[in-house]
Amino acid sequence: MSQTLSFVLKTHSVRKDFVHSVKVTLARRRDLQYLYNKLARTMRAEACPSCSSYDVCPNCTSSDIPDNGSSTTSIPSWEDVTKTSTYSLLLSEDTSDELCPDDLVNVAAHIRKALSTQAHPANTEMCKEQLTSLLVMAEAMLPQRSRASIPLHQQHQAARLEWREKFFSKPLDFLLERIGVSKDILQITAIWKIILEKACYCKSYGEQWFCAAKQKLREMRTFESDTLKPLVGAFIDGLRFMTVDNPNPMGFLPKLIGLVKPLNLAMIIDNHENTLSGWVVTLTAIMELYNITECTIDVITSLVTGFYDKISKATKFFSQVKALFTGFRSEDVANSFWYMAAAILCYLITGLIPNNGRFSKIKACLSGATTLVSGIIATQKLAAMFATWNSESIVNELSARTVAISELNNPTTTSDTDSVERLLELAKILHEEIKVHTLNPIMQSYNPILRNLMSTLDGVITSCNKRKAIARKRQVPVCYILTGPPGCGKTTAAQALAKKLSDQEPSVINLDVDHHDTYTGNEVCIIDEFDSSDKVDYANFVIGMVNSAPMVLNCDMLENKGKLFTSKYIIMTSNSETPVKPSSKRAGAFYRRVTIIDVTNPLVESHKRARPGTSVPRSCYKKNFSHLSLAKRGAECWCKEYVLDPKGLQHQTIKAPPPTFLNIDSLAQTMKQDFVLKNMAFEAEDGCSEHRYGFICQQSEVETVRRLLNAIRARLNATFTVCVGPEASHSIGCTAHVLTPDEPFNGRRFIVSRCNEASLAALEGNCVQSALGVCMSNKDLTHLCHFIRGKIVNDSVRLDELPANQHVVTVNSVFDLAWALRRHLTLTGQFQAIRAAYDVLTVPDKVPAMLRHWMDETSFSDEHVVTQFVTPGGVVILESCGGARIWALGHNVIRAGGVTATPTGGCVRLVGLSAQTLPWSEIFRELFTLLGRIWSSIKVSTLVLTALGMYASRFRPKSEAKGKTKSKIGPYRGRGVALTDDEYDEWREHNANRKLDLSVEDFLMLRHRAALGADDADAVKFRSWWNSRTRPGDGFEDVTVIGKGGVKHEKIRTSTLRAVDRGYDVSFAEESGPGTKFHKNAIGSVTDVCGEHKGYCVHMGHGVYASVAHVVKGDSYFLGERIFDVKTNGEFCCFRSTKILPSAAPFFSGKPTRDPWGSPVATEWKPKAYTTTSGKIVGCFATTSTETHPGDCGLPYIDDNGRVTGLHTGSGGPKTPSAKLVVPYIHIDMKNKSVTPQKYDETKPNISYKGLVCKQLDEIRIIPKGTRLHVSPAHVDDFEECSHQPASLGSGDPRCPKSLTAIVVDSLKPYCDRVEGPPHDVLHRVQKMLIDHLSGFVPMNISSETSMLSAFHKLNHDTSCGPYLGGRKKDHMVNGEPDKQLLDLLSSKWKLATQGIALPHEYTIGLKDELRPIEKVQEGKRRMIWGCDVGVATVCAAAFKGVSDAITANHQYGPIQVGINMDSPSVEVLYQRIKSAAKVFAVDYSKWDSTQSPRVSAASIDILRYFSDRSPIVDSAANTLKSPPIAIFNGVAVKVASGLPSGMPLTSVINSLNHCMYVGCAILQSLEARQIPVTWNLFSSFDMMTYGDDGVYMFPTMFASVSDQIFGNLSAYGLKPTRVDKSVGAIESIDPESVVFLKRTITRTPNGIRGLLDRSSIIRQFFYIKGENSDDWKTPPKTIDPTSRGQQLWNACLYASQHGVEFYNKVLKLAMRAVEYEGLHLKPPSYSSALEHYNSQFNGVEARSDQINMSDVTALHCDVFEV
């Protein structure tokens, strides 16, 4: 950049053209200014976040600098700024001085003004791009704490934050691609910050982020070095080879012909065939011709693995070409040739097509290029300009990375130690990269900028080191206190002692001051008179110093913040014998950490006694400190006589040991020893290390084994180190330990079986195993001898240390280097070899640094390979085995000695007993190694022979097929046999079904024999297969098989299973049953004594079975056992059996609606006598569409709730197959004792209670009174302004005198009215459609839970236990498990459920404590709470929780939205679904729960049962939920006739399924009323979203045209559809841009698609608060939980931020008032902060613990909202 500015300012002609171009551009901008400002207001929502970097910035505000650039009170004028040294350094190449930060800020301020005001004088000297670049670099070069003074800094930060929100969730490949193509420096900075942030937290995001960050920080987009220079270099080398090295080009022609072999090549091409075998033959011949067969086979694997990586980048080329052509604008070009030449030159140098702004510069330089000479001169000027642009792009890239790293150096961003360590490593990498650029001669003019960037990174590195030190355990210092009378020489002795402990000057701390900026951190610290001040808590200060935990010193200066105490030795002095009193609570901790030295000076004491009042002479002090008496006290001696009492009671009871007298030298030595002992730590030894090898021998053989290992190391030039004993020394490779059998060792052990001096001769034969007598594989031996730990680069070379070469490669081109490196690398590492080869060839003088960077990120293979590369810059020797060592020399050195010897283990390792000690992995490894060697020797010949066989097969006679089989399925036909398409399908299907491999001829022959009626086994099986293949695709039959093993229920398929046709399906056109028997797990076969089937029976539970009399008369058996205790009532009978079926069916006296196979039943259900073949039978006449047969008697007929109401007992025969005779269910008492306790007793008489027909109970459970909702202290006077109040409290409430009992009775009365719902046939057709629709994403046969406790733990433990047990579930839990009372209740219900018996369906009734609208409070309306029995809830959770979870997990794809989080991107999916509809209807329903038809609820439960397994638990749960609910309150039990209790298990899912079927039935009836037959699945032709009673219907035009009739049908079903806002009027389509669903308004906001919570719901959060239960709700609660209340108000602020700043300011005042009056420790967030937090939580960037991912409860902390 500095070269560009110098070029512009110093070259008059160029400057004149340049300024003219700028003026023209500015004039055009002024003409378009008005239009731009007008459009900016309307397009602000979609504006680029980096708009602050352009000419007219919408984010900019007015500046204090005048338009003419004159001075202000704090900023000098533009004329004065241009005279500063900083400005001169920016425009010159002087690199001796640093840039002044203050002057840099002033320059940036004027540049900002120049960007916003065209009148500023800077616009006449520099263009917009230069001004913007200077401003960006000014921000990067300043330290982070000084950037706030730069203009536009906050706008830049805001822009980067917006980019961060847009790109944070993008994958790594997308971000890296954006860095490569983006021209926006703010966007690039934000992307770098995202990459580096995720790299710091790679534990959460993946290790690939950290690896990619390290790699990309070392890379720079230098197109000139990467592409242009190698291209030019290759051209020069080729030209030199053709001219200088080969002066006679024609002499090269014979060599070229001999190399190409054109005649052989032509013959191969002539014989080529365009078939698979032809290509194999041709390619193999070409590989043989040029002798590249082996290397081609080795390379194919690498090419295939990299193929998919290239495909993934195919779209990048298209996007770049598109951006190139769409970014151009028209230019008036006088000479297009030179114009395009300049553009091509710019691309070759910078790697980028020049943008529109730089095209104007090119045009200005080429305006006078009208001749050849002037064109060449202009091109030279442009080349210099392009080189400067290339350097500028590097500086801008480095600036962006520096800003990103410096902004991550924040405790709120990088919070843990791991992230700080990774940030430190990344900062060091970038620092090293910038340092490399400072050494580049081309970048010398940018050294001031680069040095400032390095200074910024130095600050980051220092800060990270401080943060790491704070969190790291430190060495515990040694603290000695010199006590004694004043004047004895303690301070002087402390100084002398410090010099003996360390060569550094001691640090000095004064505890009388409260900050310690003067502390230097040296090894010794002296604190003189540490206890002189009573105001200082010196005891705790000393305890903090002598500690392993880091101690942060209190410092006043900003740069010293975070300074740690790091001294190793602490010397303190004191005049007190007891610095800390023993009675102090910190005395024990203090004296445990310090050692006290009692210092006395006998000469001084005698002088003071002899001559009191005279000064002490110097003769009393000696230089060697022999005048001092140093007495070291014992541990924890608080004075000379006593030791601290461990119990802290009597401190004068334990005598101190005698002191130890020392001199100054021995004291220093003692302190050093104490420091070493104090910091010794016991560390757990690692497990078996794979790099440690132990050779176990006898003690007498240790020296011999050591000599053998050293001989092996010298013979093989190995890298391991020989150690005697388990202790290891430093080694670059493995360590070989010579051990005795008794020594412990964590490594791999090998037993030495032979060991003598004569074995040294065996090494010449290279048989290491025979020499040592150990059993080792070749791989282990190679690993021992040649493994290299890490990557090592040796810049200095000793010839005796170089390994012997295995390969010598002369590098003439980049391909030579890459091809040789492949031997050293794994498959992943081979792709990085090409990059390294480019670096080596382009910059040969930087070979060690580049190879070091490359080696750090490269994975080397485990094979030992040594290669010597002879390059133009010198010789490089690379040795690899796990790791790598590299020697880079500037001259040619060839190591003599041939090929390195490969260690082998000998041929006897698997013979005899040696194999017994090898693990199987080693044996198989040897086998695979042997197979690999065999393959390597035959792979070429195998390929050649295969190709030769294919070539020979060309001349084999072939049969031709005719017709459509020709060239179609020829490979599948036999010799001379052609199949039609149908025959081909038959052949394939027959082989697949019968698991055969018949040829075509055998299949045709078998089919022919079967058609002729052959009776052999194969022909009979074929005819059976053919008949089953021709049957319908959906035929199957359920059968009961009775055998020796018992009774089995199996499904026998009568046809092959075929795919479902999703098109026209006639099964939806009319009602039909499912084809399977209801309650099949409860149905058994009744047989006679011979086992012949007579009829069926149905299990009622506990071994009681129901059947018909003519089936069980005589000797009847069930499951091979005679039945007993037979009781009859007419034709209906019951009996007992000890054989119990796995499930039971519920019975009920009522009218059936379904026959045993699910078909509808038409009957008047009036019993009368009918004449049958078995005599007169009293039964009911019915008609169905199912044909029955003899033996079907006893099968159940059911009602809408799945209860058995009658048994099949006869039919009309072949003449009238639809006529059926059904025996009604009659109660027969078969109970020996009560089966299960229940509240509702059928035997008790009915009573009337306040208009309800009910049963009286023995106990009375009253309805809870009072409320926990109170007025907030902040709104005692104005709570009436709120639209909601706590619900009515009963008869004593002045707002509504209605009693709680009356409220419950009024709420229950609608449940007692019968609601019919949709017609039977319509309902079951829609049920089939919904099942078919859900089958697309809900799996079948979801297993039920088999563990009772596991099912119980799936429940919400904050809810009621139901009518049989008082309190909530968590009240009956101990240590997370149920107590005995709850466990007994669960066990009794679970036992019945495992037998398939339905449980009592009873609920306890309460009233919900909540806020209600004031008008509803005055009317006395409260919502009921149905408390379900905990046993029923557990059984239902076990049966259907898996199905429910499968449905809710796919809410994005289906109509049911249970489980959706309206504060997440899921709301965007809802918005897209709504927008795609032709018409949208939002519907709510009044009194939804009480208007539900039992038949619809039973159909929904059957849907859940359809997707679950067929276990008894599922039968029990389904039968229980289908039975009528019973409400229990105030000592009465009411059996309701309709409705769906709100506390029913899985109520949200069942309600949603009901909703879907209601809407489907209404649509079906509306269409068929218009003579439109519905033969398709309705749910595939429209979309809907439902959550209980909330619904949004997205109708196509056809459905919308009959919407009035649809809603009319819903009303006819008993429902009460209303508008969402409860207003009166017909339901009409709404605007899809603002749809209300789940009390949320789904709309587009400036932040994206959001679900806005109702404003009144947010505001009433601040008026009421939860507290103790009371009737006085107008009085604030006595205690307030500040945590939950603070979280509630915080979330309310976040929700309010989505409604805009005006509404948020209103909420903010309420929040501040609540904080003040309620005493909360909460600071309400500002609008921008609340908006940022909500958006972060919405996008998943910032998680919160109170997030509720379900919309049936509010996402705020408190449940005050009306749901």
Swiss-Prot record:
Residue positions where O-(5'-phospho-RNA)-tyrosine is found in the record: Y984
Catalytic center residues: H1110 (for 3clpro activity), E1131 (for 3clpro activity), C1193 (for 3clpro activity)
UniProt cross-references to SMART domains, sorted A to Z: AAA
Keyword Amino-acid biosynthesis: no
Mutagenesis / variant outcome for changing C1193A: Complete loss of protease activity in vitro
Keyword Membrane: yes
SUPFAM superfamilies the UniProt entry points to: DNA/RNA polymerases, P-loop containing nucleoside triphosphate hydrolases, Trypsin-like serine proteases
Modified residue annotations for Phosphoserine: S1067
Keywords, ordered alphabetically: ATP-binding, Covalent protein-RNA linkage, Eukaryotic host gene expression shutoff by virus, Eukaryotic host translation shutoff by virus, Host endoplasmic reticulum, Host gene expression shutoff by virus, Host membrane, Host-virus interaction, Hydrolase, Membrane, Nucleotide-binding, Nucleotidyltransferase, Phosphoprotein, Protease, RNA-directed RNA polymerase, Thiol protease, Transferase, Viral RNA replication
Gene Ontology CC terms: host cell endoplasmic reticulum membrane; membrane
Stated consequence of mutating E1164A: No effect on protease activity in vitro
Residue ranges constituting the SF3 helicase domain according to the UniProt record: 458-614
Official protein name in the record: Genome polyprotein
UniProt source species: Feline calicivirus (strain Japanese F4)
